[in-house]
């Protein structure tokens, strides 16, 4: 069990830059910041047509969607890797719950409902591999889609009823 105040999370296939943690930690001087998310980059983005298409899709999510949500104060989700969490934010939000496939999205939304702020770092990237084979890609997308639907059924009623700004 990790014991630190801040928890860095990286999947095994991610290759963060050696100085990335120093850059992310600075945001936690604000005691309300619960999570800092880096942008994903793609080690094998040019491998084949499938990886090129995924690069476009993922860049749309990370460059456009996550940036916009963060800059407008809207909810955005921690993408399961390439970031740092404040331990207290995880604990106060109910911890990692395993009733959805996308535990990252679930925890992200619960933490933001509790008032924790999230920071998205467009200029800090963590390169990783993306699926090069269609069946692996389809399985990944099915998991993500099912997980987000599970989170929706679990949390969207609370989100809609929460006294949050319209922009969320």
Question: Model-found features: residue ranges?
Answer:
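Long helical/loop segments within the catalytic core of UDP-sugar-dependent glycosyltransferases
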Residues: 1-5, 18-101, 112, 134-166
